[in-house]
C-alpha cells in the first residue's frame, strides 16, 4: 500500500493514544485547579484568613510548583507501576502549585469593598468568598486554567516516554524501532501538534471573550 494512502489510517490508529493523553491532562488540570483554588484562598493576605496560615500555604505552593513533574512521575511509576495514574498525579501535583500561585495573585488584586460590605452585614467568611470574591476572580481563573491545560497536554505527552501511557508511550515505541517506523512517528507528531494547536486556539478565543466581557462591565 502507498505510504501516503496509509497515513490517514495511522492517524486513526493512534487517536486513542492521543485521547488518553488529553484525558490525563484534563483530569490532572481539573484536580489541580480545585486544589489550587483552596491554596489560593488560604495564601491570599487580603481575604481575612488566619494570618499564620498564609505563609504556610504559600510555601506549600512553592514546593509543589518547584518539584519536577518528571522526577515525581518516575517515583510514582516505581511505586504504582506503568499506567496513566502516575502521570495524572504528578501533573496534578505540579498544577496545584503553579495555578495556586497565579490564583493567589488574582485574589490579592480584587476590589475588597464588596467583601467589607458583606462583612459589615454579618456575612460569614464563606459567604463573602462566594458572593464578593468569586464573581471577580472566576474570569481570570478560567483564563489561567485553559492555559495550564495546554501546558499539561505537553507535559502528559512527555511523561509517556517514561511509561505513563498515552501518546508519549507510542512515540517512545516508534522512535525505539529506528528505521521503518518513520511514518508512525510522523503520524504521532501530527496528532500531538494538531491537538495542541486546537487547544491553543480555543484558549485564545476564550481569553478574548473574557477580556471583551470584562471591558463591557
Question: Could you tell me what each predicted segment is?
Answer:
Residues 1-28:
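Periplasmic/extracellular loop-to-transmembrane helix junction in inner-membrane transport proteins
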Residues 143, 186-217:
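C-terminal transmembrane helix and the adjacent membrane-cytosol boundary/short C-terminal tail
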Residues 82-133, 139-148, 201-204:
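Membrane-cytosol interface at the C-terminal ends of specific transmembrane alpha-helices
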Residues 20, 24, 160, 173-200:
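Pore-lining and gate-forming transmembrane alpha-helices of multi-pass membrane transport proteins
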Residues 25, 29-37, 41, 45, ...:
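Hydrophobic positions within alpha-helical transmembrane segments of bacterial inner-membrane proteins
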Residues 13-16, 20, 55-65, 105-120, ...:
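Short amphipathic alpha-helical coupling elements at transmembrane boundaries
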Residues 38-73, 102-105:
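Cytoplasmic-entry segments and transmembrane alpha-helices of multi-pass inner-membrane transporters
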Residues 16-24, 68-98, 184, 188:
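Loop-to-helix entry region at the N-terminal start of transmembrane alpha-helices
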